[in-house]
Regions:
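Short, structured surface patches at the beginning of a domain
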Residues: 1-148
Length: 148
């Protein structure tokens, strides 16, 4: 497989509660998954990590402390990696706004739990990938509401 070539590569991690950090997908586990994905896809480690600890995934991405910092440094052809889509978003409307903004700026978003991170979900032209990503976003929103 040819390794993909992009500019800067960033990992984004999020947990919303201490309980989730202990018994869910911890920040350390997310960083480990993202690093492995980066090494596999790009043969290099991420250039940095942005971490929102104790922040709800329902909050608009750009209103989160590190979400905003990440937004401010991203440039065309950069990459954002997440371990799981629900670590990025927990509301379908947030997913749609992030995906559309990233697509418009040619920023590539990869999620390990979507096709093993093998295809950019923000710039994909595949109707099947787009449908699957929307379904995963819907499930993430449903799961957030069902847990409350």
């Amino acid at each position: 497989m040819d390794k993909l070539q992009y500019e800067s590569i960033y990992g984004y991690c999020r947990v919303s509660s201490d309980e989730q950090a202990k018994h869910g997908t911890s920040l350390a586990e997310q960083k480990k998954t993202i690093t492995k994905m980066s090494m596999y896809l790009f043969e290099r480690e991420p250039d940095g990590f942005y971490v929102d600890d104790g922040v709800s995934g329902a909050l608009d991405f750009y209103k989160r402390p590190d979400g905003k910092k990440l937004q401010n440094i991203l440039e065309p052809n950069d990459v954002v990696l997440v371990a799981k889509l629900d670590r990025l978003i927990r509301r379908l409307s947030v997913l749609c706004s992030v995906r559309d903004a990233f697509n418009e700026l040619n920023i590539h978003l990869f999620a390990h739990d979507i096709l093993g991170g093998a295809e950019s979900i923000s710039t994909s032209k595949s109707p099947n990938v787009n449908m699957f990503v929307n379904m995963m976003g819907t499930f993430a929103e449903w799961d957030r509401k069902a847990d409350t």
